[in-house]
A protein has these predicted regions:
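Structural signature of tandem-repeat unit edges
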Residues: 1-12, 22-35, 45-58, 68-81, ...
Length: 217
C-alpha cells in the first residue's frame, strides 16, 4: 500500500491508524477530519508529503514519530490542541500557523510560552529554558541526544512524562525548588546523568522517572 485517499466520511484518524505502514508514501486527508490520534502515522518511513487540512483541531502524541522521509509539516490555523509531542523523533521542517502555539528557534511552545511542547534543535549541547515556562511537556526533550547542559528556571512547577527520556548526554541537573512533580520516565535512559539535586518541594516522582540513570546510591 503506497497511496491512500481517506474518504470524506472519516472525521477522526485514530491512534496508531497508519502506524508502521512503511510503504505508505502518499496520503490525502479530507477537510472533514478533525483529529489525528497518538502515533497515527508513526514509523511511516516512506511518507514524503502530508497536508493537514484546516478542519483538524487536535494532533496526538508521537503522531509523526520516525517519519524519516517526511520533509515538512504545517500546523494549520484550526489546531487548538497538541497532545504530548506529536513531532518526537521527527527532524523535518515545521511551520506553525495556529495562533494557539508559538514556534521559535526550533522550540514549540503554547501561545503564552508557559509550556514547552517540543524542543527540536537536535544539535545543540546547551539550553536555558525561558523564565515564562511553568511546564515541561510530555516528551518535550525526548531523545535530544546532544543536549549535555540544561538550566531549568524557578518558574517551572512540573516536568512531564518522558520529558528528557533518552537525553543520553545530559550530565548534571539542578531541579529548582518550584518543581512539585516529576512524572513517569521523565529522565529515563539519561545514562550520563551522574549529578542531580531534587528539592524538598517535589511531592510526586513517577514510576521509572530515573530508570537507567547513572546516579549514586
Amino acid at each position: 500500500m503506497s497511496s491512500v485517499v481517506i474518504p470524506d466520511s472519516v472525521s477522526c484518524i485514530g491512534s496508531g491508524a497508519f502506524k508502521n505502514c512503511s510503504s505508505l508514501s502518499s496520503l490525502v486527508i479530507p477537510d472533514c477530519v478533525t483529529s489525528i490520534g497518538n502515533y497515527a502515522f508513526a514509523y511511516c518511513k516512506s511518507l514524503t508529503d502530508i497536508v493537514i487540512p484546516n478542519s483538524v483541531t487536535s494532533i496526538g502524541d508521537n503522531a509523526f514519530r520516525h517519519c524519516s522521509s517526511l520533509s515538512s509539516v504545517v500546523i494549520p490555523e484550526s489546531v487548538v490542541n497538541l497532545n504530548g509531542n506529536p513531532f518526537c523523533r521527527w527532524d523535518g521542517g515545521l511551520k506553525c500557523l495556529s495562533p494557539y502555539f508559538i514556534y521559535d528557534n526550533k522550540v514549540l511552545f503554547d501561545k503564552d510560552k508557559s509550556k514547552i511542547i517540543a524542543f527540536r534543535d537536535k544539535n545543540t549541547t546547551s539550553y536555558v529554558i525561558p523564565d515564562s515556562v511553568t511546564r515541561i511537556g510530555e516528551s518535550a526533550f525526548r531523545h535530544c541526544s546532544s543536549l549535555s547542559s540544561l538550566v531549568i528556571p524557578d518558574s517551572v512547577t512540573s516536568i512531564g512524562e518522558s520529558a528528557f527520556s533518552g537525553c543520553c548526554s545530559l550530565k548534571s541537573l539542578v531541579i529548582p525548588d518550584s518543581v512539585t512533580s516529576i512524572e513517569c520516565y521523565a529522565f529515563r535512559g539519561c545514562e550520563s546523568l551522574s549529578s542531580l539535586v531534587i528539592p524538598d518541594s517535589v511531592s510526586c516522582i513517577g514510576f521509572g522517572a530515573f530508570e537507567g540513570c547513572n546516579l549514586p546510591n
